[in-house]
Amino acid sequence: MYSIDSIKYLIHIHIEAEGVVEKTDVVGAIFGQTEGLLGEELDLRDLQRSGRIGRIDVQIVSKHGKTAGECYIASSLDRAETAILAAALETIDRIGPCMAAIRIQNIEDLRAIKRRQIVERAKELLLESFDEVGISTYDILTEVREASRVEKITTIGPERLPAGPAVLESDAIIIVEGRADVLNLLKCGINNTVAVEGTKVPETVIDLSAKKNTTVFVDGDRGGDLILRELLQVADIDFVAFSPRRRSVEDMSRKEIVKSLRNKVPASVLKSHIEKDEPISDLVFEIEAGEEEHSSVSQKEEGNNTTPDVPADLPEEPPKSNIDEAIIPPITTSEQNLVKPENPHTIQEHTQYMKNTGRSRVLAEDAGVIGDYSLQELKAILPKLNDDVAGVIVDAAVDQKFIDQAFAKGLTYVAANAFEGIVRRPAGLRLIPF
């Protein structure tokens, strides 16, 4: 046949003869009837001897006294010379003893085939050989910054506890379980952390907690529960934060860490609810703390003049609303026996009015009624409430999902006859049992 390694074009020729002819007749007609037609430079015999055209490939079939088929001639001439040669072949009118007609079907550019093969192979090589995904400038900067933060981890005290570089200078510290937790918080830009490295609380941590605003950030499992119980007994803890369920602090993303620290719980409230046989992370926070406990934590926070060395974008505590921040205690038995007020004007009167109704009420800042709904209706409209809503009263049990939705909507209090499965109380949202 022919090779596409050295040729440029392939001439496709269609042959029809009025009789039975052989392949040798076709080849002879091509050489014989074009000889001297185009001059010495385009003589087919000379071109074939010099390798500028290939072998003449003839594929014909004789049937019913006629012959038809195809013929292929490979050419390494330029386009103009190849076109002239192809046009000359169409002048052939006899093959052997028979009348014949030759027609050029097309001239195929074999270099275009090579180009298509190159493109397809390049695509395969691009997918197979270049595995590494291009890295952006942001990714490079993030990787370098994280590496520098990891290098800044230090040790403090005679126990050589892993800690962030700013733990001694900062007015606020975060106590975590181990070195891996310190490293992860450093990657997130939080450099005022210290690890206890076990269930026995080191003296260095106890001393720091007495001088600084202290938050404990532990896993929500048995190990974190044991560490937290001892810290609450021997150290001066202000706030407690938990990792999400089935997640460790060392594996959390920056977004998860910020969210957990935002939802920290005052330790003073936590201490008054601890039962020895109940995991702290599973505790239902029925807020019954008095004004004195709540204000003592606030005074300690306000007494620090220096801004804590924590990331600038960590959320601040929500601003206080016009409603008194004292937690409303549960209604006593004597109050329950009172006649329901016809026109309630306070939150406590509204809770008394809604008790045993099985419904819910939405209140404005001035304790005015916005609307009464069933619990299912309230859950449906809660995300759509207007900004003038201050709180809700529910004569039913509410869960953590409801509390999270209320906090996200900006409510300042939720009153209910029971709180079930509450593992964290968002800062600034009061839970009022009745």
Curated annotation (Swiss-Prot):
Reactions catalysed according to its record: ssDNA + n NTP = ssDNA/pppN(pN)n-1 hybrid + (n-1) diphosphate
Gene name in the database record: dnaG
Cellular component aspect of the GO annotation: cytoplasm; DNA-directed RNA polymerase complex; exosome (RNase complex); primosome complex
Region of interest (Disordered), ranges: 290-319
GO molecular function: DNA-directed RNA polymerase activity; metal ion binding; poly(A) binding
Presence of keyword Magnesium: yes
Skewed-composition ranges (Basic and acidic residues): 292-303
Binding site for Mg(2+) 2: D219, D221
InterPro entries: DnaG_primase (IPR050219), Primase_DnaG_arc (IPR020607), TOPRIM_DnaG/twinkle (IPR034154), TOPRIM_dom (IPR006171)
Biological role stated in the UniProt entry: RNA polymerase that catalyzes the synthesis of short RNA molecules used as primers for DNA polymerase during DNA replication.
Entry's family note: Belongs to the archaeal DnaG primase family.
Pfam families: Toprim_4
Residues the entry annotates as binding Mg(2+) 1: E177, D219
Protein name: DNA primase DnaG
Cofactor notes: Binds two Mg(2+) per subunit.
EC class name: transferase
Domain Toprim: from-to ranges: 171-250
GO-annotated biological processes: DNA replication, synthesis of primer
Known EC number: 2.7.7.101
Quaternary state and interactors: Forms a ternary complex with MCM helicase and DNA.
SUPFAM superfamilies: DNA primase core
Names of the cofactor(s): Mg(2+)
CDD domains recorded: TOPRIM_primases (cd01029)
